[in-house]
């Protein structure tokens, strides 16, 4: 698996269709490319490829000055056939190798109710801080030092 920075202008028709299909599998609101394109253009978009096929994507936003040196993973979506721990680990391990030169910290906002996701993220190096949400339930902000991700430790050896 590999991770490549992508832009709306450089996408092939097959990749556009894949992005739309992946997005539709999570939420029905992206009913057309015209609906999805503005969202993608506001973020830094990276695609996860298995061979030449786009199997997932992630949207990132560099954080403001208060959290300088960090990047926020705002959206992480993939084809359902890649919803297994091995595939998810492969995708997540590609992030620090792509961002560690520019950022030191990766942030993610995850709902407290997603216990399996939280357990997975903890095992790959994230720590957490609970923040109250507007509805009072509280979300978990996950933080990870990009240089201490397990994959980065392997590369240092």
Model region roles, listed by residue range:
Residues 25-51:
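Active-site rim helix/loop that mediates acceptor-substrate recognition in acyltransferases
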Residues 67-81:
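Conserved acetyl-CoA binding element of GNAT-fold acetyltransferases
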Residues 120-131:
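Conserved acetyl-CoA-binding loop of GNAT-fold acetyltransferases
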Residues 1-31:
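Short amphipathic alpha-helix that is part of the acyltransferase structural core
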Residues 43, 101-105:
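Short, high-confidence coil segments that cap the C-terminus of an alpha-helix
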Residues 107-118, 134-137:
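Conserved beta-strand-loop-alpha-helix junction that forms the acyl-donor binding cleft
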Residues 47, 53-63, 69-72:
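Conserved beta-strand in the GNAT
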Residues 83-97, 123:
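Conserved acetyl-CoA-binding loop-helix of GNAT-fold acetyltransferases
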């Amino acid at each position: 698996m590999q991770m490549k920075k992508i832009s709306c202008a450089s996408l092939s028709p097959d990749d556009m269709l894949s992005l739309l299909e992946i997005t539709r599998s999570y939420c029905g609101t992206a009913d057309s490319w015209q609906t999805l394109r503005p969202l993608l253009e506001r973020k830094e978009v990276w695609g996860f490829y298995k061979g030449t096929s786009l199997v997932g994507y992630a949207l990132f936003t560099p954080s403001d000055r208060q959290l300088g040196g960090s990047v926020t993973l705002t959206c992480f979506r993939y084809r359902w056939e890649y919803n297994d721990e091995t595939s998810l680990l492969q995708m997540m391990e590609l992030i620090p190798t792509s961002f560690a030169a520019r950022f030191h910290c990766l942030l993610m906002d995850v709902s407290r109710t997603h216990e399996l996701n939280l357990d997975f993220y903890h095992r790959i190096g994230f720590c957490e801080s609970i923040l109250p949400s507007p509805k009072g339930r509280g979300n978990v902000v996950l933080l990870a030092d990009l240089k201490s991700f397990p994959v980065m430790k392997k590369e240092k050896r």
